[in-house]
Amino acid sequence: AVVVNPSLCIGEYDARPFSGRAVLAFATPRIPVYVRHTFNAVYTGDVAVGHIRAAERGRVGERYLLVGRNVTLQEFAALVARTAGVRPPRWRVPYGLVWAAAVATECAARLTGTEPLLPRGVVHSLRAGQLLDGAKALRELSLPQTPLEEAIRRALAWFRQHRYTA
């Protein structure tokens, strides 16, 4: 078997937004804060190509990280905000405050029967961070590297076209 592990996928066709939630959140002027966090984001189209190339060229028993760019949450939020034409978040908040907000949104979600805006698992992941190196996938699979700015632009265009955001 050949295994592929994509990082946070950003792009079109996120019909039930999961990773797209981050794009949608920072595309509105309602989110004035961010936490210190570094993660990796990759364009969904690059992930699709990576899956195909792993099936065609991948070595049996190997694992390939299908990744794009390592970025701080502050940088990501600024890219999304600039693309959406809104003000980026300005204040960094401590994890304790974010954890309390996560608990509150989970309680509210339970009462309303909806998905929590900020699950505690997400806050736990934020604190851990995620710096990834996809050199093997670049080298062996020739994984495309679409710029994160383009992935965000395409995601926002798709979300707007399908009325997820203004």
For each feature predicted by the language model, list its residue ranges.
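NAD(P)-dependent short-chain dehydrogenase/reductase
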Residues: 1-3, 7-40
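Residues that recognize and position ribonucleotide moieties
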Residues: 2, 40, 69, 91, ...
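Substrate-positioning beta->alpha
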Residues: 17-18, 35-55, 62
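A hydrophobic C-terminal alpha-helical subdomain
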Residues: 31-35, 39-46, 95-140
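Residue-level signal for the nucleotide or nucleotide-sugar donor/cofactor binding architecture
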Residues: 42-45, 71, 146
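Mid/C-terminal beta-alpha module of Rossmann-like enzyme folds, strongest
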Residues: 50-117, 134, 149-166
